[in-house]
Amino acid sequence: MKRRVFLGLPVILGILFYIWYIFHASDNVAYSDYIRLVNSYLPDVTNPAKFFVPDILTRVPITYLGRIINVKLFGYNTYFDMILGVLSLGAGAAVLALYAERNRSVGYLSFLLIQFVYFSLNKWEMMTNGTGWVCTLSISGFLFHFAVLDHAAATRCRNMSDRVLLAILPILLVVLVAGPYSGGYAVILLLAYGALWLADRRGGAETSSRSWSRKCRRTWCIGALTTVLAMVLYLWSNSQAVYVHRGAVTDVSIAQEFAAQPLFFLRFLLKAVASSVIGVAQIQDLEAGSPWFVRLHLVYLLALYLNVRFQLYKKTIFPLLLVLSGGCNHLLVLAARWIFLKDEYGMSSRYEIQYQMGIVGILLTFALVWSVCREKAQETEADKAKTRVPEKRAARTLLKVCMLAFTVLTVFGNAWTTRAEIRTAPYRKAYLQVSRELGLNYRTASDEDLETYLHNDPDAVRDAMRILEENHLNIFR
């Protein structure tokens, strides 16, 4: 009970910290992505014709419910969406706390450091733009699904609740919540289910109960099938959508662009990985292109190696799933954003919540490896002779130094970013207060000011402000 309290306390404090931050760094004003949403869905947010469209899954159905509640009860207040984002972020932190409760190898200090990184302000752009709450909810949903899968694998699928959740979570997440963000999630799940099925198939004769082995394989198959079904539904819906990429500077294929300038893609990935450790502004101060800094991407490979070398996957697959998800998310962002031909595009704060899965997985891996090393150090010499890891002492020391160095760098980088964002918060709020005044005076404001401060086409801004004014919503409430 005491451990649960200690594990839950950082989650609550992190939520309260983010609520404090958004009220000091943001304001209730519809701008940027909100302009498109206002013009598309308001004021008749309950109109079925706007809901039942061929590309409904790309529009994320759960956002319709959130929009209805916001308009009907809160007058379309952007703080409502931001609070949803904070609570969604807290849900992911709660999943990490649940995992730490189940896996006592994660020490409390390691857990605190992970929570500190998790609640850092490197995600400020996503959290202060209320429309991003569904992305945060999606990531937390993925964390929950991975935690359920980890528990099911560790307990041989003995819990009915685990089996049911593994069957229905892909449908709930992909169809209702996470459609646009579910590509990497689905790939990692299918790889995990395939590996688990093969492991059970190969080791079935050695298990204490063959019936449980068959039940596990059936659970993995059902989970994989529902994942494929959910993705087929989403991809069909996505095929009906029409996308407009504002700011895209090329129309050639990714293969042609890679052949023309392969180093661009490498720089894109390296800078994106670096941004998940240290904030964008701080990276620019440190000149992220330096040879020392780009080596950060090797930590992903180190984490994968450690999961295999110490056979952590036999006890828990959760950290490995997170590491793979983080790496996959980097590739997906590259695949979606390379068309802008800006190698710093992947460093945007809006993607940090997706990258952070990998960082959390790396830190969890290090925590578990550190626990294994500590246990071996406490064994008797006779036990060491039977179970020791074959690395030499120098190699083990080097490994510990590398893990400690990355952990310190990650904590320091996120602390630096958070400190800088706390100092910047009043200026961000002041900027949005100017945006609010321009929105209130949209009829007389210049096109340049509307585009600069409300981050959208001036005509679209005026149309959106007119809708809000006529219905007494948002800044006109």
Locations of the language-model features?
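Intrinsically disordered, polar/acidic, low-complexity terminal segments
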Residues: 2-67, 71-110, 161-162, 191-223, ...
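Transmembrane alpha-helix segments characteristic
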Residues: 14, 111-118, 222-232, 313-339
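Membrane-embedded glycan-lipid processing machinery
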Residues: 28, 80-84, 123-134, 347-351
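Transmembrane-helix signature of polytopic, membrane-embedded enzymes
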Residues: 100-121, 139-140
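Specific aromatic-rich, kink-prone transmembrane helix
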Residues: 113, 134-157, 190, 358-361
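Hydrophobic/aromatic-rich transmembrane helices and adjacent perimembrane loops
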Residues: 127, 134-138, 343-368
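Membrane-interface alpha helices of multi-pass inner-membrane proteins
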Residues: 160-193
